[in-house]
Amino acid sequence: MQHADENHGIALSQLVEGNPVATIVIDAQHRVTHWNRACSVLTGVPAAEMIGRSEQWRAFYDTARPIMADLVVDGVLESGIDLYYHGKFSRSLLIDDAYEAEDFFPAFGEGGRWLFFTAAALRNAEGEVIAAIETLQDITQRRRAEAALREK
């Protein structure tokens, strides 16, 4: 992506923060660089507890394990992603080295939440992976409506 001005870092932060879709960005060392307001609302974890740390898994899981962005930033092959998201993920049809998945998170909200999430590598001008971005959307209402239709 080409940037029109020298303040693209500020613009990126503003873009991520203003995005109504929960968004996480991690660097190549797995440190959270961006945890937007929507992500704080979705997870109940404030950005101040995540930025600069490598424990993003705590917002989603009871035990230490990678989130999808961690796998993508490491260049893990599909077989490695399958270890964590078996039967729940697919390659992005739009972006190379990107994946999407749906999964249930029982600790979120009352009765848990279904999330649809995507993760993609971010590369520098030389093509090296320097970060990964993950977006998350609450699809619980849709999943419950689908289940209700199946029960009829």
Regions found by a protein language model. Name each.
Residues 11-131:
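PAS/LOV-family and closely related PAS-like sensory domains
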Residues 1-11, 124-128, 137-152:
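PAS-associated C-terminal cap
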